[in-house]
Amino acid sequence: MKLVVTEPETEALRRYLRAAGGHSLVTSALARVEVPRAVASHGRAATAKATALLATIGQLASSLDLLDEAADLGPAVLRSLDAIHLATARRFGADLRVLVGYDRRLTEAATALGLPVAAPT
């Protein structure tokens, strides 16, 4: 979202990603729905930009096993989509350099599971 619609953290996130050059960006395939819908209120151009951006990011499909893992993740306040993103991140194991996120519940849950987290500001 922050790479599609300008928010206070957008420039910091862009700098962070440039500095991390050479590392692959990956996300859950659910971002194919989540991101365009999140920016839809900003108009068709934002939706098109989101779709184009997602085409440059690796996406891991949500298998039934992954969804079951997400259902079992705590804490209880973790929202469903965030649980899927977190389960997706866990699938990368030691290859995961960092989970970049700005949702407090998601980043706290990731930290509790021992995942590296960044929220560039």
Task: Show where each model-derived region lies.
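Acidic, PIN/NYN-like endoribonuclease modules and their adjacent C-terminal/linker elements
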Residues: 27-28, 32, 41, 60, ...
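Residue-level recognition of oxygen-bearing side chains
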Residues: 9, 65, 105
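Acidic catalytic patch
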Residues: 55-76, 82-88
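Short, well-structured N-terminal submotif of metal-dependent ribonuclease cores
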Residues: 1-27, 39-51, 55, 121
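Phosphate- and divalent-cation-binding pockets in alpha/beta enzyme and binding domains
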Residues: 12, 34, 69, 108-109
